[in-house]
Amino acid sequence: MTMISDLSKDLVEEILSKAPITSLGAVRSTHKQWNALSKGRLLYKAEAKDQFLGFMVMDHRFLSMIFHLNGILKGDGEGFDRPSIREVGDIVNQIDISKVFQCDGLVLCVPSDNSSVVVWNPYLGQTKWIEAREPHDESDMFALGYDKDKNHKILRLYDECYYYYEVYNFKTESWGEEDHLPGWDIDSYNRGVSLNGNTYFLTQEQRAKDKYRVFLLCFNFTTEKFENFIAMPFKYHRKYVGTLSCVGNEKLAALYQRWDTGEMAIWVTTKIESNEVLWSNLFKVDMKPLVRFGFQQCKDEAGSFFIDEEKKLAVVFNLDKKRGKRNNKTRCYHTAYIIGEKGYLKKEVLGEAVEVRKDVYRSALVCSSSYVPSLEKINQIEEEEEDKCKSIKMVDTKRQRKKRKRKSKR
């Protein structure tokens, strides 16, 4: 009979790679070797090249997603597997989620009731509810990051006129003093992107001579200040769309599309320093065959996307509206647009979108980088209980040893 301990390391890694993201924590209790491998499991070689593993919010449902990239660029479509999307059976799926952010293996969810936020560690299965000082508005922006000591924090940015902001500190379990960002505009639909603890936004200078100029703005979670306004390699206009993503934990990526021409460009950073950011154009493509009027840019949303730099492709999530021929009724579908260099275009429908209110729909929001498991404990009560259990076990073990010694002497 084959035992778990008889399985090779390669086979165990293959089994773990097939396990859902949210089941990794349960795997740890199966066997000591599996526990060690799952702890060290970032992304296996096959996954890093062939799959995107992450989270998304679609119609207020919190979902895990595996997007298969292997065979995606074949012209005949053979070898392409549809993305695997499933609901997460956890406390975060017992509520309506409006926004989702990811940083360092932790996921920040903003419920639709606007009274609190919840941070979740999918690997450990821990959640931490954080009450807001006051109910937040639908247009408020959030970000998750950490300081130089790896202490995690949450940024809340609100009031589109004056851009006030406050920071929640996990260590002190409290919100800090209110501050504001003078002279700059950050569109609420453009979510920030977390990279190496800091969060980056696209912004424009208020009352500037060149009103179409776009800047990259960094929020530093160590200083808890906005800094480094660095010009982007493109300009904004009513007919232009721009949004950010990232490439692993090393680079930023920017999507830029002109609605008038249908041209889309993907840019990737080659250098990120405090006073200088350099960009390289990954590829350009004409989107008119797939999207007639360009990606939609609505309140609380812009086309979220992720890229595979090696394959030179991007997967953009947005809405695709179709008008019925018989009843003239518009139906809206969640759609993944797979875009690559040399004009590669493919459209994958994920399902029909739910109407938020009359003729209003919300695009799916996707975390921009593959999920990397974290051992960061975010629930202090659970952590204290676990430490107590360990202490009790140690005491019991010592008592048992003493009893055995007494018996041996007799």
UniProtKB/Swiss-Prot annotation:
Region (Disordered): 386-410
Biased composition (Basic and acidic residues): 387-398
A matching Pfam family: FBA_1
Annotated InterPro entries: F-box-assoc_dom_typ1, F-box-assoc_interact_dom, F-box-like_dom_sf, F-box_dom, Gal_Oxase/kelch_b-propeller, SCF_F-box_component
F-box domain location: 2-49
Biased amino acid composition, Basic residues: 399-410
Top-rank taxon, per record: Eukaryota
Signal sequence coordinates: none
PANTHER family per UniProt: BNACNNG10540D PROTEIN, F-BOX PROTEIN CPR30-LIKE
Protein name per Swiss-Prot or TrEMBL: F-box protein At3g19890
Source species of the chain: Arabidopsis thaliana
